[in-house]
UniProtKB/Swiss-Prot annotation:
Lineage: Eukaryota, Metazoa, Chordata, Craniata, Vertebrata
Subcellular location as annotated: Nucleus; Cytoplasm, Cytoskeleton, Microtubule organizing center, Centrosome; Chromosome
Superkingdom of the source species: Eukaryota
Record note on quaternary structure: Component of the DCX(DTL) E3 ubiquitin ligase complex, at least composed of cul4 (cul4a or cul4b), ddb1, dtl/cdt2 and rbx1.
Extent of the WD repeats: 47-89, 96-135, 138-178, 215-254, 270-309, 314-355, 359-399
PROSITE patterns assigned: WD_REPEATS_1 (PS00678), WD_REPEATS_2 (PS50082), WD_REPEATS_REGION (PS50294)
GO biological process, one term: rhythmic process
Keyword Cell cycle annotated: no
Main location group: nucleus
A Pfam family hit: WD40
Organism: Xenopus tropicalis (Western clawed frog)
The protein's name: Denticleless protein homolog
Encoding gene, per UniProt annotation: dtl
Pathway where it operates: Protein modification; protein ubiquitination
Keyword terms: Biological rhythms, Chromosome, Cytoplasm, Cytoskeleton, DNA damage, DNA replication, Nucleus, Repeat, Ubl conjugation pathway, WD repeat
Length: 713
């Protein structure tokens, strides 16, 4: 063989004690390339390009160069990889299924193959004549995998999405025109329920014709034969590789089947992940399991240990369509990847960076290494192409490849050392952080867990997290520094949580003034001297007004165009608030009413209150003018969030005030001239010592500012 003559060729001047130095195979992996004539597009029935799902080289000695490819539309094509004539490249083509073919397997040493399709059937074909030999029915969902035993040409196994593993024997007679399974493992990879041994969940008996629920079953993604009596399988969710003894009848038990041996999930993920493919080396000792956590685990299939012997990484496995293959001598492992490349690892040294076969523009799914020729590799991709990679074995082939357009090449993947990974971290700036108790850099803490598989890398730390942190101050301290100084404008991407809470859909970010804290509604309100008639518009005036229902149907709150009513509550506050209305300067000059301060309310209204005509309030950092009698009568609003059916002194006082309003005395007392007569009847209006049992309804609740005002005696 030409390849062996190149590999075993001794190096000149390197002979030592009669033993020649040979070329290491690792150095030859970078010589793989794919020429333009070795790229084949997979077409469907109507001529449209469709992705290929499975490929496999023939096991017949005189047809080992024939590659079988099955695509998404159920078409199987046989390619002659040694033929350079485009017209004679496709040896055979036939429609195997009316649905997608997910896996394909050759009968050992014969011109036959079996296809596993999404139409819930497996079919045995004679590839020379293109005839259907038999059809296998029994699965209730799509078939995902099919495998033959090396020791039996008539026995093969299938696994499907219904969670069942079925064994078929083509030597049995056909019943109803198709084959029936000779052995079945139902629920092979069901999720283990947390239950006591005394309460074992019994499996429902199988009813023919009734498809099991896919939600209650766990899909079997791959099955292979270890020997004529042993099957190895893997699932999509449980993360366990199970070994089954076919000499045991698993259908006779009503509980979930128990495997003869299992390999638990060895990864560091917080949840168990499934496997997309299983493959054994030529000796049958090493088992390679391709997991969806971007690792390929190698187990010792003949030993007693269940921990992986080696782990191969560097690629990406995000789907269950990615397959693996082993070189004919068992020294190298080939796998597809989601990053548009195929990877080759050295089995004896997993730490060596893999060799990548680059050229596809989509995910590389199924791969196959020709078992009779080390220099030939086939890859399938979602870019609707099948590529055959060849090894440049001489200078003549290299010169010929220069004339031909190359669409794929091999290269050694660069390994990032741990020191460079640490340099990718965002540098810390402790000088910009005033507090020494905060973390000065994104370096993990000492007590942080060792596993960071589900955590972001240190290099992903945003730089904005290292910006200077403003001083933590209370609202009173912020006001003490000066109300006139406006902070820097905050961008929409750096709005604090407090800004999001106090904003409305139509309001913009407060850039001129700092957002007042919702807790300021409960702080004592101080009096300030009279302000100018030109009132500065505060942020709350720009908020969208929301009309609330009135306390009664006959009283309606009418807001003028120049009224600055604050009728929207701060989100998250369930406490009573003030509802103040401020009118224009013309109405403010003509009003001579008298209002109380909140400090007087807290002292129980024991002190006399006689404010001047220019008395104002400061609520939430906003200077408001005093209330007028008209505003007191027209601000009869019912707060939906503040209303409460609890009977207290405030509700009793409101009920009494409502009853007084309906009397003729209150109607006469609405004018300023009749206040003296009404004030004599009610000299004081202090809060009662105990609550009065008066029926309270949400409609009787009124604003607190409408109840308290001094009557001139």
């Amino acid at each position: 063989m030409l390849f062996r003559s190149v590999v075993n060729k001794p190096r000149l001047g390197c002979r030592q004690r009669g033993v020649p130095f040979t070329h290491p195979l690792q150095s030859l992996l970078q010589c793989y390339q794919c020429a333009k004539h070795d790229e084949h597009t997979s077409y469907g029935e109507l001529g449209a390009a469709v992705p290929p799902f499975g490929c496999a080289f023939s096991t017949v000695p005189d047809m080992s160069h024939v590659l079988a490819v099955a695509n998404e539309e159920g078409i199987v094509r046989l390619y002659d990889t040694e033929c350079r004539d485009v017209q004679r490249l496709v040896v055979k083509e036939f429609m195997a299924h009316t649905n997608a073919v997910f896996d394909i397997a050759w009968v050992p040493g014969e011109h036959k193959l079996v296809t596993a399709s999404g139409d819930q059937t497996a079919k045995l074909w004679d590839v020379k004549a293109g005839d259907l030999i038999g059809e296998c029915k029994g699965h209730q969902c799509s078939l995902k995998s099919v495998a033959f035993s090396k020791f039996e040409k008539a026995v093969f196994s299938t696994g499907g999405r219904d969670g069942n593993i079925m064994v078929w024997d083509t030597r049995c007679n056909k019943k109803d025109g198709f084959y029936r399974q000779v052995n079945q493992i139902t629920g092979a990879h069901n999720a283990l329920d947390k239950q006591t041994p005394s309460k074992v969940k019994k499996r429902k008996p199988y009813v023919r014709g009734l498809a099991p629920s896919v939600d209650s079953q766990q899909s079997v993604t791959v099955v292979i034969f270890q020997d004529e009596h042993t099957i190895i399988s893997a699932g999509a969710v449980d993360g366990i590789v199970k070994v089954w003894d076919l000499r045991k009848n698993y259908s006779a038990y009503r509980q979930d089947p128990v495997p003869a041996k299992l390999f638990p999930y060895p990864g560091n993920s917080t949840r168990k992940l499934g496997y997309s493919n299983l493959v054994l080396d030529p000796t049958g000792t090493n088992l390679f399991a391709s997991c969806t956590d971007d690792n390929v685990y190698m187990f010792n299939a003949t030993g007693l240990k269940t921990e992986p012997v080696s782990v191969f990484g560097g690629h990406q496995n995000s789907t269950f369509y990615i397959k693996t293959s082993v070189s004919p001598d068992g020294q190298f492992l080939l796998s597809g990847s989601s990053d548009h490349s195929a990877y080759i690892w050295q089995v004896s040294d997993p730490k060596v960076p893999p060799v990548t076969l680059t050229g596809h523009c989509q995910e590389v799914t199924s791969v196959a290494w020709c078992q009779s020729d080390f220099t030939k590799i086939a890859t399938c991709s979602d870019d609707n192409t099948v590529r055959v990679w060849r090894l440049k074995r001489s200078s003549e082939d290299s010169a010929q490849s220069d004339k031909t357009e190359t669409v794929g090449w091999a290269c050694q993947k660069k390994c990032v050392p741990p020191s460079m990974a640490a340099n990718l971290c965002t540098p810390g700036k402790p000088s910009m952080i005033p507090s020494s108790s905060l973390m000065s850099s994104p370096t993990p803490a000492t007590c942080a867990p060792s596993y960071t598989g589900d955590l972001p890398m240190p290099s992903s730390t945003p730089v904005s997290a290292l910006l200077p942190i403003p001083k933590l101050q209370t609202p009173q301290r912020l006001n003490g520094e000066g109300l006139g100084a406006s902070p820097k404008q905050t961008s929409s991407s750096k709005i604090s949580i407090k800004d999001w809470i106090t904003r409305t859909p139509k309001s913009s970010t407060r850039a001129d003034t700092k957002t007042p804290s919702p807790r300021k509604a409960f702080t004592p309100v101080e009096q300030y001297p009279s302000v100018s008639s030109t009132r500065v518009q505060m942020p709350y005036e720009k908020r969208a007004k929301r009309r609330l229902e009135t306390s009664s149907e006959d009283v309606e709150h009418v807001c003028l165009d120049h009224c600055n009513c604050v009728m929207e509550l701060e989100p998250g506050l369930k406490k009573a608030k003030l509802d103040l209305c401020s009118f224009s300067e013309k109405e403010r000059d003509g009003s001579d009413d008298k209002c109380l301060r909140l400090s007087d309310l807290s002292r129980g209204f024991d002190q006399e209150f006689s404010p001047g005509p220019s008395t104002s309030f400061l609520i939430n950092g906003t200077v408001n003018p005093p209330l007028s009698p008209l505003s007191e009568l027209k601000s009869d609003l019912r707060d939906k969030e503040n209303s409460s059916p609890e009977k207290n002194w405030l509700s009793a006082l409101g009920h009494k005030f409502k009853s007084d309003k309906s009397s003729p005395q209150n109607k006469a007392a609405s004018s300023p001239s009749s206040r003296n007569s009404t004030s004599k009847k009610h000299p004081t209006r202090n809060a009662p010592n105990s609550p009065v049992s008066v029926p309270t309804t949400p409609g009787s609740m009124r604003k607190i500012c409408t109840y308290f005002f001094k009557k001139s005696e």
